[in-house]
């Protein structure tokens, strides 16, 4: 008989038990469920709601139940629906009818909200640490490539030369925002819903703040209806995870391109690539492709959660059982990607010569010729038109700007002098952009110093 079965005259259909059960996935919350129950029973003892002897017996029984679950010795059954009822049934089997006192002043509605908040609190800390490791791997690559010049792109067309280190640092700061978003979300995650009951609170003289303090929460959810209805914190976690996945996917797209023969900018280590069952020569960037591909899973979980919530009246509805699998899978998917990413980036080889060749054989120094003419007195629009004509001439003659003679340059403007050849070199183009945040070496070094300071302060 189910623990809530007193009002019913017949057992639940076996197919309903199987369909409605969540134990196959919410068993992941077992340790958090028991952690919450230990705090709850300590509060029941403190407030003299149940006898101290019973509370102590329940607490010891919960610890035994946890050890059995962790050892794989506990039988978790669809008949008891979810982790909460399974734990309570195991507790009663362990300590007898006194275990039935545990649920005094509590509902599964506030209990599950508590478990999920405890779970996400740990997950956010774990993912934040993994993100910092990825940031450090990118900084390591940046430091090793302070003199590596590559094409910068807009519209996937070569635009202006940049340092490879500058490109790496762009992602460092993207991931920094991701860490900050996760950390900021803790303000909303780290509130205790316990004591809200099913929806309206409880008639027992409980101490919600005691439970919150025992569990390390910053405070309590202020409204009992909101406490059991709220899944904003799950949506926010999924949204933050989707943004991390977006940033990882963008970098993976570049790694896939850069590692191709068409670019030949980087070589991923053999340990992060795979071969072909048919083509012996192949070295495929499967890890980068999978990280890119699995981003869709995380997006899907976010949309699924929003869609589940959009039509729900207050307070708890069984639809909300669907809030966990997406949360669990988003965590595991993102965790797997981040665990692979740092060592993949650290072991990646950068083809400096290929990058330099690419940036030399193009027109990405055209803006610098235009800026040069502005400094000689032209308006930017005038210089833009003049340089456009020069580029067109080069294209027609199968030349690049640095292939032109001074005489040819002067056909476009008499103000151009011999110094133009130094101005248009890739290294000069890069180092001319010394504005804060720019691609010049001194600017990138400042970015690295700031990023390292942020990582150090987060320890």
Swiss-Prot record:
One Pfam family named in its UniProt record: ASL_C2
Keywords noted in UniProt: Amino-acid biosynthesis, Arginine biosynthesis, Cytoplasm, Lyase
Protein's cellular compartments: Cytoplasm
Pathway in which this enzyme or protein is active: Amino-acid biosynthesis; L-arginine biosynthesis; L-arginine from L-ornithine and carbamoyl phosphate: step 3/3
Keyword Mitochondrion: no
BP terms from Gene Ontology: arginine biosynthetic process via ornithine; L-arginine biosynthetic process
EC number of this enzyme: 4.3.2.1
CDD domains (alphabetical): Argininosuccinate_lyase (cd01359)
Originating organism: Oceanobacillus iheyensis (strain DSM 14371 / CIP 107618 / JCM 11309 / KCTC 3954 / HTE831)
Matching InterPro entries: Arg_succ_lyase_C (IPR029419), Argininosuccinate_lyase (IPR009049), Fumarase/histidase_N (IPR024083), Fumarate_lyase_CS (IPR020557), Fumarate_lyase_fam (IPR000362), Fumarate_lyase_N (IPR022761), L-Aspartase-like (IPR008948)
This protein's name: Argininosuccinate lyase
Catalytic activity reported: 2-(N(omega)-L-arginino)succinate = fumarate + L-arginine
GO molecular function: argininosuccinate lyase activity
Family recorded in the similarity comment: Belongs to the lyase 1 family. Argininosuccinate lyase subfamily.
Highest taxon listed in the record's lineage: Bacteria
PANTHER family in the cross-refs: ARGININOSUCCINATE LYASE
One cellular-component annotation, GO: cytosol
